[in-house]
Amino acid sequence: MTNRYFKQLLLAEIGEEGQKRLNGSSAVIAGCGGLGTVIANNLVRSGVGRVIIVDRDFIELDNLHRQILFDEDDIRKGLPKAVAAAEKLRRIDSDITIEPVVADLTAGNIEQIIKGADIVLDGTDNFETRFLINEACVKLGIPWIYAGVVATYGMVFSIIPGETPCLQCFIRELPGPDESPTCDTVGVLGTAVNIIASVEVTEGLKILMGRQDSLIRKLIYIDAWQGTWSAYEIKKDDKRCPVCDERQFAFLEKGK
């Protein structure tokens, strides 16, 4: 075991066995923007052995205040986010397998991309993609972590098919375009992005190490500006969920 992880190995919560599990695990990151770049950075530095980054966008100047893997040179090169991120991450740890996928996640490709992964982490900025991820992960039995951040606050919730409520257990309908604030309408605090993504990865590492007993298992809500942290119990109600109870995969089916 390389001494790269020496300080992490000292943690009772991880240790040598936990590190071996991380080194042998595979993660998919959906989106390589504010959340996604922090997620990727933390996964690679933690020693997750294979990281797949899915994003079709190119880097723009207004990304740089929060998307930590990118710089002005990447903009001059005209690189896609997934490719630029992969180049940076390989320089951080050349032993990690980094696979950039320059594409949107769609009903036509998502199952092929995430098949065989141990976890999917949410770095997206829209609920249509999240509903798609939720359906694909429930269908294939892959844990995933929902996360979102806007303005100064964000939330994280770990979803383990067959054990926890899924996303559509508590968000039944796709929110309308004007129902929720977005980073384009109200902005976003870079430090809030870092905090939410770091909590998301921490929960993800627990899953990858088989430490589900340590999962918070609540919807975590953090406001970085106010300095507040809350956790809300999410329970399945009496109404059966169309996805995890009825196994109806409307978003997967409509795009095929």
Give the residues covered by each predicted segment.
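Adenine nucleotide-associated cytosolic modules
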Residues: 1-256
